[in-house]
Amino acid sequence: MSIEVSNESGIDVSEAELISVARFVIAKMDVNPAAELSMVLLDTAAMADLHMRWMDLPGPTDVMSFPMDELEPGGRPDAPEPGPAMLGDIVLCPEFAADQAAAAGHSLGHELALLTIHGVLHLLGYDHGEPDEEKEMFALQDRLLEEWVADQVEAYHQDRQQERDRRLLDKSRYFDH
């Protein structure tokens, strides 16, 4: 899986965290691991321009998704495996997201993780134009965010335990001499 991040927003964000959440969602949604994803972070002026150009809507927005190759299951069982596919582009606006995060009472990192999930789901064909679609997409988005956060917490605790174990082993070696 290749995920490229280009931060043109002027705001310092954790690219590693964005890649982590995108990888997690792509794996959970059973997308071919050879798929490629591009993420671009823009300032509000550039996002407003993109929003007007592609959606004909004024002002910036939080996230936009631009799907590339259609990744549908199926095909003949004896057909060769397709090569790497370009999932698409996700464009995020951290400045806009920061305002949303403050209004929601959580961190910018949390908001950007949520928006990354939202963007990946759009690339996979999910939409929220109709009430039923919105209910399905937002429930899936919330579940994936919850699972990713739990995964991150577990990894953090495992890392801390490994560090404690390493220090304990180092101390025991000191006393063995």
UniProtKB/Swiss-Prot annotation:
List the Gene Ontology MF annotations in alphabetical order: metalloendopeptidase activity; RNA endonuclease activity; zinc ion binding
Residues annotated as binding Zn(2+): H118, H122, H128
Question: What subcellular locations does the record give?
Answer: Cytoplasm
Q: Which enzyme class, named as a word?
A: hydrolase
Q: What is its EC number?
A: 3.1.-.-
Entry cofactor note text?
Answer: Binds 1 zinc ion.
An example of a Gene Ontology BP annotation on this entry?
Answer: rRNA processing
Entry keyword set:
Cytoplasm, Endonuclease, Hydrolase, Metal-binding, Nuclease, Ribosome biogenesis, rRNA processing, Zinc
GO terms for cellular component? cytoplasm
Q: Which cofactor does it need?
A: Zn(2+)
Q: Which family does it belong to?
A: Belongs to the endoribonuclease YbeY family.
Against PANTHER family, the record matches this protein to: ENDORIBONUCLEASE YBEY, CHLOROPLASTIC
Q: Which NCBIfam families match?
A: rRNA maturation RNase YbeY
The protein's name: Endoribonuclease YbeY
Q: Which species expresses this protein natively? A: Mycolicibacterium paratuberculosis (strain ATCC BAA-968 / K-10)
